[in-house]
Amino acid sequence: MNGTARAPALGRLGTYRTDRSYAWNYEHGPAWAGPVPAVPATAGQRFFGLEVASRLGIAAGLLLNARWIDFYARCGYDILTYKTVRSRHRVCHPMPNWLFVDPADAAALDEAASAVRARARPHAGTGADWTSTVSFGMPSRDPGVWMADVAQARHLLAPRQVLVVSVVASPAAGDTADSIIADFGRLAAMAREAGAQVVEANLSCPNVVSAEGDLYLDAALSGRIAQALRQGAGTLPVLLKIGHVPDEARLAALLRAVAGQASGLVVVNGLSRPVLDGAGTAAFGTGRRQAGILGRGIHAISVQEVARASALIERDRLDLQVVGVGGVACAEDAERYFEAGACAVLMGSAPMFDPALAARMKALHPEW
């Protein structure tokens, strides 16, 4: 990389304005002045029994509402995940919500939970090179608002496109496991009623400090949640989004616990790390030292986990499939996930910087 290269201007990075609030992006985004790409024709594939034009899509996070889903559907993404919703209103964390990890720290990401440094502007390069860190806290509109918007999003999709709705429980202080399980079950039923074709439960948000952030680490509880989701979702496919599980025995136990209720797992939901500014204090502010890491720096770890989960599913003959997500910014990145055993590949931050990514992938790999 040329040492004289300049960092891109803040606010002109992609469809999500990182210099604006979540509320602004919800009301005014996606902020994209460029053209919508021409989308190549494909023969089509299956995604948990549903016909899709491709097994390429967008993970929970970027698609804030129906307007965002419509834009990315027209750009050629065929599996579209509505940003995580709750059974009650939840405000977003204050700004900043999206920062960029120092390249040296991003390159050194591994199993150790070492702190990383972050700043508002990315270093020189493009979105394919960047590792981001985010801290939103899984905000949600009231159910009446998001259910109507989900219905609108479903109406906007073309044939052979699938709407996934991501849900998460909202435990209050003193809530029991039973109340968390019941909340997930209610949400699955609400998502189904609103028009979801697939229900995804987020068991692993790396940027919240409340109990819903690490449910996937409890295999028995995850199994009970999967059962409640299955009851609420009816015949719809049920996916569980999990975080990084470096211990193979623990991952195997989780897979066995949810098999028979869940249809598959989405692997992985970023890495949780301490995120610091140049002065060594919490980059996102007081009480928000831990945040989610996504983008280039987590790709290798995420592919490895997909491969491990796929091997365990085959070994134990479980009726589960794995959806890969993490650090996909080119066709070669997606190919590594398919080779590792993923049935589909979702993208998180890269489509924000590069909406035409799926169209280029389809041109190279119409079989996907």
Positions of predicted regions on the chain:
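Alpha/beta catalytic cores of nucleotide-metabolism and tRNA/nucleoside-modifying enzymes
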Residues: 1-38, 105-114, 296-321, 329-368
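Glycine/Thr-rich beta-alpha phosphate-binding loop at enzyme active sites
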Residues: 26-40, 203-218, 255-318, 360
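Active-site entrance/lid segments in N-terminal catalytic domains of soluble metabolic enzymes
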Residues: 29-32, 67, 73-257
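N-terminal amphipathic alpha-helix/helix-capping segment at the start of soluble metabolic enzymes
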Residues: 34-57, 147-160, 310
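Proline-centered loop/turn at the N-terminus of a beta-strand
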Residues: 55, 162, 236-237, 264, ...
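Glycine-rich beta-to-alpha transition loops that act as phosphate-gripper elements at the mouths
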Residues: 60-63, 166-170, 242-248, 319-332
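Glycine-rich phosphate-binding active-site loops on the catalytic face of alpha/beta enzymes
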Residues: 76-90, 203-205, 264-274, 327-328, ...
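C-terminal helical cap(s) of enzyme catalytic domains, especially alpha/beta-barrels
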Residues: 89-107, 275-291, 350-368
